[in-house]
Amino acid sequence: MFRKIYTNISITLIKQLREASGSPINDCKKALESTDGNFEKAIQYLKERGLAQAEKKMGNQTKQGVIVAYTNNKVAALAEINCETDFVARTSEFLEFSTNFIKTIVNQEQDFSSSNIDSVLNDKRKQLVGKLQENIVIGNLNAFVATKNSVFGVYQHNCLKNTICGLGGSVVELITESELTDVKTQILREGANNLAVTYLGLKPRFLYQHEVSSDVVDQIRKEVEKEFGSKTAQQQNFIVKGKLQNYYSDNVFEHQEYFLNEDEPKTIKQYMAKELEEVIKDKVKIGRCLYLTI
């Protein structure tokens, strides 16, 4: 038996459903026709349709998207949210979802990973898939909870439409030896934000020199012995030292250039010593760090 299609749907009702659901006009019209003009049932119809479409698009490649970074000073989070096309990545709906997503994660105030996104967030993602007609994936998600002695800095690069969504982002944690005061916190937070900028710009492989494997030193020494075998051991050691300094400058954050102050060149280590440790009269070290780019 064929079901009679309800066609007496007002334009006003269709527009109201469009505003409430964010779904395309044609989908709203079809939803109202399929539910005999019942607004609440039409909302549910669109929700179920969106979930079904999300399942169909799960296998689609997602090579575009945004990076979002955010902190409420207790938790810092950095996420990569992917979609299929650059066009969708710049829509207000996608940027709003990405912004609300990262803020929800941060305000839950717990360590998080992509594997334990709660069902509410996942349902919202699926609904957006139905609206935008593209697969949307949380590609990378990390959240960190501050300790009583640490502060976070965050940075977003190339922000889109005045949001916290961009093409790159970073999080840097600074840790003190003694407990924080309000004054210390304010100074360190500014420093952490500055370091987040440089961390994304420099993209170091290591934070500190001691993290570099002895294998790297051995490899450089072997290369020098092979290339400069005719030179004395003292000369070779001098060359090794120079090559290691270059390696550290290229790969180790503490030895890289703090490029935000071109008038007074200094390394990250020197910046932390002069601008942070001397000012707050306390030892400061870099803790958890992460950067992501599209």
Curated annotation (Swiss-Prot):
Annotated InterPro entries: EF-Ts_dimer_sf, Transl_elong_EFTs/EF1B, Transl_elong_EFTs/EF1B_dimer, Transl_elong_Ts_CS, UBA-like_sf
Superkingdom assignment: Eukaryota
GO BP: any one term: mitochondrial translational elongation
Keywords: Elongation factor, Mitochondrion, Protein biosynthesis
Places the protein is found: Mitochondrion
Pfam families reported for this sequence: EF_TS
GO cellular component, one term: mitochondrion
Molecular function, one GO term: translation elongation factor activity
Principal cellular location given in the protein's record: mitochondrion
Role summary: Associates with the EF-Tu.GDP complex and induces the exchange of GDP to GTP. It remains bound to the aminoacyl-tRNA.EF-Tu.GTP complex up to the GTP hydrolysis stage on the ribosome.
Stated family: Belongs to the EF-Ts family.
Miscellaneous information on this protein: This protein may be expected to contain an N-terminal transit peptide but none has been predicted.
Record's protein name: Elongation factor Ts, mitochondrial 2
Organism, as annotated: Paramecium tetraurelia
